[in-house]
């Protein structure tokens, strides 16, 4: 196996797991770099690429296929890395972008709510009640 993609819920330490896995295996670890590469190569602001993944297409985008074009830019940047093999990807939509590639191990990390609350408290310096409220509202 030469490609691992890791998806995660918020505050489940997916980045940490991905980086340690890549280090242990001697693989390249990639994430947001893909968006930056696509943004630079196709001269598209990074925020537009992020919105293409998160938001519903606008009326204009439905007619111009803007969303599909942006998604294909991101996929191209990711596939350029995957072709080299020995990659751990932990960025946006990895399971989607690598859907029909047979030599990909797809991992989903889910942390229990108690661990997520602790991590939110640690990172954001919040009370446990406020952290729990924020996590439940996502």
List where the protein language model places each region.
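Conserved phosphate-donor/acceptor-positioning beta-strand/loop module used by diverse small-molecule
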Residues: 100-123, 128-137
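ATP-dependent small-molecule kinase phosphotransfer cores
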Residues: 33-86, 93, 126
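Glycine-rich phosphate-binding P-loop
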Residues: 5-21
């Amino acid at each position: 196996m030469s490609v691992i993609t890791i998806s995660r819920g918020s505050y489940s330490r997916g980045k940490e797991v991905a980086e340690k896995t890549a280090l242990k295996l001697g693989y390249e670890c990639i994430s947001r770099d893909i968006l930056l590469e696509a943004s630079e190569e196709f001269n598209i602001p990074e925020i537009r690429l992020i919105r293409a993944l998160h938001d519903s297409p606008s009326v204009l985008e439905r007619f111009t296929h803007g969303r599909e074009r942006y998604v294909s830019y991101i996929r191209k940047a990711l596939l350029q890395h995957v072709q080299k093999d020995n990659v751990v990807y932990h960025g946006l939509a990895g399971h989607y972008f690598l859907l029909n590639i047979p030599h990909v191990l797809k991992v989903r990390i889910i942390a229990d709510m108690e661990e997520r609350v602790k991590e939110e408290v640690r990172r954001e310096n919040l009370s446990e009640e406020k952290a729990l409220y924020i996590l439940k509202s996502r």
